[in-house]
Amino acid sequence: MFRTMMRAKLHRATVTEANLNYVGSITIDEDLMDAVNIVENEKVQIVNNNNGARLETYVIKGERGSGVVCLNGAAARLVQPGDKVIIICYGLVAEENIHKQEPKIAVLDDNNQIIEMLGAEKAGTIL
């Protein structure tokens, strides 16, 4: 059996743009993608901390070092520049590997720079 497990997360990213007329997806600074091992065209879930909206889309590489987090297409209706979002990527893990799998979590500042890397979350942690 396989389970769907959280394998990567960009925590408290700041939306830099919302582009309604783009084809679709989310554009993410490639440095941030690399930090948590998210690849172009991979499916992600986005949770908007400001309004509670949740959506799924795929990733497009953004310029390295730019800090870009841009929601494109229909997703642009669910965010505003400045909103705080959590970008989560899941993967299928075989039952025998459940306890060996450790996610990569990057906690970001207001400029989408990594301030901390976590390997796991602990209950009651407030960031």
Swiss-Prot record:
Subunit structure: Heterooctamer of four alpha and four beta subunits.
Pathway(s) the chain acts in: Cofactor biosynthesis; (R)-pantothenate biosynthesis; beta-alanine from L-aspartate: step 1/1
Active-site residues annotated for this sequence: 25, 58
Binding site for substrate: 57, 73-75
EC number from the UniProt entry: 4.1.1.11
Cell compartments where the protein resides: Cytoplasm
Protein name: Aspartate 1-decarboxylase
InterPro entries: Asp_de-COase-like_dom_sf (IPR009010), Asp_decarbox (IPR003190)
Function summary: Catalyzes the pyruvoyl-dependent decarboxylation of aspartate to produce beta-alanine.
One BP term from GO: pantothenate biosynthetic process
Coiled coil: none
UniProt catalytic activity: L-aspartate + H(+) = beta-alanine + CO2
Cofactor(s) annotated in UniProt: pyruvate
Gene: panD
GO molecular-function terms, A-Z: aspartate 1-decarboxylase activity
Cofactor note: Binds 1 pyruvoyl group covalently per subunit.
